[in-house]
Amino acid sequence: MQSRKTRALGKGRARVTSCDDTCATATEMVPDAKDRILASVRDYHREQESPTFVAGSTPIRPSGAVLDEDDRVALVEAALELRIAAGGNARRFESEFARFFGLRKAHLVNSGSSANLLALSSLTSPKLGEARLRPGDEVITAAVGFPTTINPAVQNGLVPVFVDVELGTYNATPDRIKAAVTERTRAIMLAHTLGNPFAADEIAEIAKEHELFLVEDNCDAVGSTYRGRLTGTFGDLTTVSFYPAHHITSGEGGCVLTGSLELARIIESLRDWGRDCWCEPGVDNTCRKRFDYHLGTLPPGYDHKYTFSHVGYNLKTTDLQAALALSQLSKISAFGSARRRNWRRLREGLSGLPGLLLPVATPHSDPSWFGFAITISADAGFTRAALVNFLESRNIGTRLLFGGNITRHPAFEQVRYRIADALTNSDIVTDRTFWVGVYPGITDQMIDYVVESIAEFVAKSS
């Protein structure tokens, strides 16, 4: 018997053409003029000098975008062609990004947080029938993380169930997830912390056993693998962020991916105002029966383009952002290699220093690291605040592990949630953990300066 979840799833001058209701204005330009402009953009890019690293003076940021000549040209070219609404670049990126993961559909949105909102909201759609999530249903998640992994549950009237994380990997473990399941549990939503995969295969099996949806927050982990398989391919839905701090960037942006055509259709509807029509922007009557529908209590033949099947949002991105994302897409592998190299150099350099718990990769994983987490030991002769302040005084950027134990924040004082087990490690993370950067813009010289600075501080403080 099928489970309820399975059942659910111009020459001489520019000539501007008219702007349709998507405002995707197009320009016809003499090719030579466009080529000259783009050549000048390349010249301009090459004239920009990369600053020489000066220890203690040049900032070492924990994260950032790495943009090259092709990225700059892609943005300018899209601007020249006045691609201002989501269009051809967006569709092409969605197709290529879905192919990268081996999934059927990808939908670009305006942020990773919006991607999380859409992913979980889609599971509440009436179109899923008895499988849909309803107010009061429970969603298991980790207590440590970024709030927008958790907020969509609250925003949909669901109940977050918090489990503790493991020190070192900073992920929730399968045994904790399994112990948290009750008759009210309907979904699991977890992030791969700082690019380090959670045990996705085992947790996916728990979800399957209990007929639960699994949503992977893959915002910090594009290119990471678990048991040889890309993170983001284990769940029913996966989300990605393209904010400049992340593995590739579109400036602002995000994406929801799925292997389910039914969920993809719901995602698209929720993203695009909740409308029932699936036409691309600027396109009408794809279904060839635009005025033949009779839905709800609307009069027969009501325009399908203005028929709404969900209480949705407008979370689309623009073609300029998609142009940058497309240019960045081919760099995922190189960026991942740089992140891994920087992480290893830090790990080797800091190994053996007293008072520091260094990060470890989840067994069977190959993380494309987002950051390098350090936890101060209980018996260290110094505090996190002292070390962080010392590093910041040397222009070495630091970050806490996002929200730490999210239940300790003012925003959650009036939120209904359940704690599945003691959040001991989550509190340790809140009190004693921080991270430094490994993104591709950090050089070996910078990594060595970070290592030297931490070693100097520990030697003086221990």
Swiss-Prot record:
Single GO term (MF): transaminase activity
Regions crossing the membrane: none
Active site, UniProt feature: H246 (proton donor/acceptor)
Cofactor(s) named in the record: pyridoxal 5'-phosphate
Coiled-coil boundaries: none
Role this protein plays: Involved in the biosynthesis of forosamine ((4-dimethylamino)-2,3,4,6-tetradeoxy-alpha-D-threo-hexopyranose), a highly deoxygenated sugar component of several bioactive natural products such as the insecticidal spinosyns A and D. The catalysis is initiated by a transamination step in which pyridoxal 5'-phosphate (PLP) is converted to pyridoxamine 5'-phosphate (PMP) in the presence of L-glutamate.
Temperature dependence, free-text field: Optimum temperature is 37 degrees Celsius.
Name of this chain's protein: dTDP-4-dehydro-2,6-dideoxy-D-glucose 3-dehydratase
Swiss-Prot/TrEMBL catalytic activity: dTDP-4-dehydro-2,6-dideoxy-alpha-D-glucose + 2 reduced [2Fe-2S]-[ferredoxin] + 2 H(+) = dTDP-4-dehydro-2,3,6-trideoxy-alpha-D-hexopyranose + 2 oxidized [2Fe-2S]-[ferredoxin] + H2O
Keywords assigned: Lyase, Pyridoxal phosphate
Enzyme class name: lyase
A Pfam family the protein falls into: DegT_DnrJ_EryC1
BP GO annotations: polysaccharide biosynthetic process
